[in-house]
Design a protein with these regions (language model features):
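Glycine- and acidic/polar-rich repeat regions and solenoidal domains
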Residues: 67, 94-99, 113-130, 137-435, ...
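Boundary at the C-terminal end of the N-terminal hydrophobic targeting segment
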Residues: 30-32
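Right-handed parallel beta-helix/beta-spiral solenoid domain characteristic of secreted/periplasmic
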Residues: 34-41, 60-67, 73-121, 131, ...
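Surface beta-loop-beta hairpin patches that serve as ligand-binding interfaces in beta-rich domains
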Residues: 434-493
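Bacterial N-terminal signal peptides
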Residues: 15-26
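Bacterial N-terminal signal peptides that target proteins for export
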Residues: 2-17
Length: 493
């Protein structure tokens, strides 16, 4: 009887254990060992011997010259995690770097501070389905400005960078970038980019997203990169492009820019989306809104205010079918092959429900850089076939809307452009140039007030729902100006 009772109890315990394991797998957890390491040698051994589900814990303190090649074997159900003993208290310096070399790895709570490297990247996603969270890179700069390296680089797919902090990068190369090939479906979310000093040097974007479409026509392929819920605070870099898309099929949404020099830019690439971003210039010199080139873009529900320069610029494109003059100097090719345009024509895109207030230049311009650097560059393709509707543009210093006219130069007289469609746009307190007789632009004095976030709200409730960036009113949990306590690592709060 006792033996039978023992067997029944043992069987019950086994069933409970199996149930617990199954439940943990269903919830995304996996049982594993916790391995505490205190030096570089122990860290290397732990990484090489870790099993799926294990957690490697780096002891608090300073870690110098750590070549952290994280390549443990893991699975989606049982990732291997590398974490700080106390988030924010493991400080890597010297020439320390982190490279994730196998899939399904997680890194949490590390800080790279005060060190420097001479090439590559401080953190490199060199695999797929990895996550880096709750980490920081602070003042990780070389002695020479010309020493080139990224802080974050993606050369894999389906990776996630979330709730991290970046401050003080002052050398050449963007803070964050990705590989042209084999880098798709990566995401950067809830990160905080602060105090990136200005230096007049091309290639110092805060983010530069390469990939399919960089030099080509629209296609089904692209980088599929998502940049969302990030805060850029005095993040100047090169002072021209904050986020620079140079690939197809990307999403830039629900981000906040505060007093940062430069613009959100669709530099190259097509089928990209800019949604629900807040670009708040705070009247600081060098601030801009958005600048785009390319086809099949969707730019909507963005709020741009108090930038010192232009609000939303639709670029002129470069004509590449043939050389129109002997002075043409193609940028990507030669006079026989011509190659790809330096700027693509803005075509078949939708710009809707954006609010642009108090820009120091133009509010909305169609045809920015038209015939600029002629004849070396053939920037003579004006935007065509676009839909511009339900935008609110107010009190911009140079003009609220500026539609650049076609030049009478015989060299370009053969070009004809499909009309752009204007519908339901409201402008107030500023000029309209080149579109005075265009239907779909209503000039009127609007009434409204500024809410607690400093955002302009129209007094007319019906008009407020249809004109301007209205998503921040209807979906404030998802779309509102971000504050520092909403982004970055938890240990900073």
């Amino acid at each position: 009887m006792k033996q039978r009772l023992f067997l029944m109890v043992s069987k019950a315990k086994s069933l409970c254990l199996v149930g617990a394991v199954l439940l943990s797998i269903q919830l995304g957890f996996a049982a594993g060992n916790e391995i505490v390491v205190t030096n570089n040698s122990e860290l290397t051994t732990a990484i090489n011997s870790a099993k799926p589900g294990d957690v490697i814990v780096m002891k608090d303190g300073e870690w110098k010259d750590v070549n952290l090649s994280f390549g443990s074997t893991a699975t989606e159900e049982a990732p291997v995690t590398l974490k700080a003993q106390t988030a924010g208290q493991v400080i890597l310096n010297g020439n320390s770097v982190l490279t994730l070399t196998k899939p399904n790895l997680k890194v949490d709570g590390l800080v790279f501070k005060g060190g420097a490297i001479n090439k590559g990247a401080v953190i490199n996603f060199n695999s797929d389905k990895c996550t880096v969270s709750n980490c920081a890179i602070i003042d990780y700069n070389p002695a020479s400005f010309d020493t080139r390296y990224y802080w974050i680089f993606f050369s894999g797919n389906y990776n996630l960078l979330t709730h991290c902090f970046f401050k003080g990068k002052n050398n050449i190369e963007p803070v964050l970038g990705n590989a042209i090939d084999n880098s798709r479906h990566n995401t950067v979310t809830f990160c905080y980019f602060k105090d990136i000093p200005y230096a007049k040097q091309n290639g110092r974007e805060i983010m530069r997203i390469w990939g399919p479409g960089k030099l080509g026509k629209p296609s089904d392929d692209g980088a599929f990169f998502t940049v969302e819920h990030n805060l850029f605070d005095h993040a100047d870099g090169e002072g021209v492009e904050i986020v620079s898309l140079k690939s197809n099929h990307n999403f830039v949404r629900f981000n906040t820019v505060r007093a940062s020099m430069g613009a959100f830019t669709n530099r190259q690439g097509h089928n990209n989306t800019f949604e629900g971003n807040f670009i708040l210039g705070e009247n600081r010199a060098g601030t801009l809104g958005m600048r785009v080139a390319g086809e099949n873009l969707h730019v909507f529900n963005n709020y741009i205010s108090n930038v010192s320069d232009n609000g939303l610029l639709l670029m002129a494109g470069e004509y590449m079918d043939k050389a129109l003059t002997d002075g043409f100097k193609p940028g990507h090719g030669n006079k026989e092959t011509l190659g790809a345009p330096r700027y693509c024509q803005v075509r078949n895109s939708v710009f809707e429900n954006n609010t642009i207030i108090h820009s120091g230049g133009k509010g909305l311009q169609l045809g920015d850089a038209y015939r600029k650097h002629w004849p070396e560059m053939q920037m003579c393709l004006l935007p065509e076939g676009n839909t511009i509707k339900n935008n609110l543009i107010m009190n911009c210093a140079e003009s609220n809307i500026d539609v650049v006219p076609v030049d009478a130069d015989p060299a370009t007289s053969f070009l004809q452009f499909a009309p752009n469609k204007f519908e339901g746009n409201v402008v107030s307190g500023g000029e309209v140039k080149g579109a005075d007789k265009v239907s779909g632009i209503l000039k009127k004095e609007v009434k409204g007030s500024f809410d607690k976030n400093g955002l302009y709200i129209l007094k007319d409730a019906k008009e407020a729902k249809t004109v301007g960036a209205n998503e921040y009113m209807t979906n404030t949990a998802e779309c509102h100006p971000l504050q520092p306590n909403e982004v970055g690592p938890s240990w900073m709060k």
